Amino acid sequence: MWRVPRRLCVQSVKTSKLSGPWSRPAAHMSTLLIHHPQYAWLQDLGLREDNEGVYNGSWGGRGEVITTYCPANNEPIARVRQASLKDYEETIGKAKKAWNIWADIPAPKRGEIVRKIGDAFREKIQLLGRLVSLEMGKILVEGIGEVQEYVDVCDYAAGLSRMIGGPTLPSERPGHALIEMWNPLGLVGIITAFNFPVAVFGWNNAIALITGNVCLWKGAPTTSLVSVAVTKIIAQVLEDNLLPGAICSLVCGGADIGTTMARDERVNLLSFTGSTQVGKEVALMVQERFGKSLLELGGNNAIIAFEDADLSLVVPSVLFAAVGTAGQRCTTVRRLFLHESIHNEVVDRLRSAYSQIRVGNPWDPNILYGPLHTKQAVSMFVRAVEEAKKQGGTVVYGGKVMDHPGNYVEPTIVTGLAHDAPIVHQETFAPILYVFKFQDEEEVFEWNNEVKQGLSSSIFTKDLGRIFRWLGPKGSDCGIVNVNIPTSGAEIGGAFGGEKHTGGGRESGSDAWKQYMRRSTCTINYSTSLPLAQGIKFQ
């Protein structure tokens, strides 16, 4: 994702002009963007003015009607009817029935279906990427790259479907076998956030399906059109293969639906992606019923650059990790620790790089930086910048709301704060980078670990010993621990997730498939004798 030639970064943030329909005054716009000829392609994704937000083999919805908006100009796109609690109950029932069919299909055959789902997304990658850009606000190359992640994880899951399983273990008893069996949990509930409305669902959905589960998805209300379009693509694949649509169900909705999922004992695993505050509430509700949860929550990620760091790697890495998706990734770098000997030079280089970021219409292939997702996010940005100033910080770049239609703010660099300032320890989902000086390895490793979250981290150094100390027990306490690359851009082949208040869950690659299955330890006696534990003998 975000592979854009450096030559395109030529227009200043502060002098950029937004052009095209994204920046037209409201007087020039009709009621809904979907009515405009330039958005006719939305119909190729099965979208229309009014969309049903419930799918369980058929489309419906009896809940509230909401309108989704384009963050680049805050114009309405289309409407979606959400799920009612009655819709939810019906969908759960149909999903449970669909599981009886899906679980009986051999894992490699399930993998073939998932591969076909990936192929279907590959065919729609440009259209769906444009929709992600339109409704979420990220630049087009990121929107397309996000859909590519779904394609990639489907390819990965298809191969994995032929490899999942447990070991055969040596038994202490003659004539006995000791094996591990892995079976599906049943119904996996998936609640995703606005910032990756396709990819995070894909990480969960593809792996959950090949492990024999059915899925119930609630996406973010503000990206409901993406949820509907994604589900339509999957539903067509299931229909073409004569399978129940309720294998992959959708219930668009708000907190009432999310709370119901968290409390529902029929939801065998609930995967939740969102804020730490809401995630804690979800975890408590699931734990209260002794259920399983998979949490991907906040991140207060750091990059550390030592005196021997290659600055030609550091500067673009920080730029990518700090302003990509306008600072709205869970892996966005929010803290930058620079050795005192290189601090001033790196800050100067970053200010120069920031001044060349091209801002504007997210569909323009030259653009590298789009809007925040909502007006509320803009307000949080403003409050965070003001609070940073009050706590002793100096804004050396940006810090203001941009005078353009839409939710645009300047990418911002703040220096001069204490490493443990309250605002630094608070995750603000916006492009604000706090920069600090450090003197030695021990103190900066401690600073990296002192925040409550533990998602992603990276150091830049050529010192081999330092690298392995960073990876070791006294190094980073994060789930993602990088060297000489950004905090963002995780590959699907590795397990994605973090520690501490990030939630502890793991998704996507490696052995994350185990999260979606239950393990049974099985002892099989194939002899004619019965050796009992502790040598007990019944006469």
Curated annotation (Swiss-Prot):
Annotated residues for binding of (S)-2-amino-6-oxohexanoate: T331, G489, A490
**One cellular component term from this protein's GO annotations in UniProt:** mitochondrion
Q: In which tissues is it expressed?
A: Present in liver, kidney, brain and pancreas, and at lower levels in jejunum, duodenum, stomach and testes (at protein level).
This protein's superkingdom?
Answer: Eukaryota
Show the InterPro entries listed in the entry. Ald_DH/histidinol_DH, Ald_DH_C, Ald_DH_CS_GLU, Ald_DH_N, Aldehyde_DH_dom, ALDH7A1-like
Give the residue range annotated as the organelle targeting sequence.
Answer: 1-26
Q: Which UniProt keywords apply?
A: Acetylation, Cytoplasm, Mitochondrion, NAD, Nucleus, Oxidoreductase, Transit peptide
Give the matching Pfam families: Aldedh
The record's annotation in SUPFAM superfamilies points to: ALDH-like
Record-marked site positions (Transition state stabilizer): N195
Keyword Oxidoreductase (UniProt): yes
Q: Which residues bind NAD(+)?
A: 192-194, 218, 258-259, 274-279, 296-297, 427
- Isomerase keyword on record: no
The UniProt catalytic activity note for this protein reads: nonanal + NAD(+) + H2O = nonanoate + NADH + 2 H(+); (S)-2-amino-6-oxohexanoate + NAD(+) + H2O = L-2-aminoadipate + NADH + 2 H(+); betaine aldehyde + NAD(+) + H2O = glycine betaine + NADH + 2 H(+); an aldehyde + NAD(+) + H2O = a carboxylate + NADH + 2 H(+)
Listed EC numbers: 1.2.1.31, 1.2.1.3, 1.2.1.8
Q: Please list the residues that make up the active site.
A: E296 (proton acceptor), C330 (nucleophile)
Q: Which residues carry this modification: N6-acetyllysine?
A: K86, K94, K97, K462, K500
Please provide the Gene Ontology terms (biological process) for this protein. Answer: glycine betaine biosynthetic process from choline
Give the disulfide map.
Answer: none
The protein's job, in short, is: Multifunctional enzyme mediating important protective effects. Metabolizes betaine aldehyde to betaine, an important cellular osmolyte and methyl donor. Protects cells from oxidative stress by metabolizing a number of lipid peroxidation-derived aldehydes. Involved in lysine catabolism.
Q: What do we know about how this protein assembles, alone or with others?
A: Homotetramer.
By sequence similarity, the record places it as follows: Belongs to the aldehyde dehydrogenase family.
Q: What's this protein's name?
A: Alpha-aminoadipic semialdehyde dehydrogenase
Give the source species: Mus musculus
- Source gene? Aldh7a1
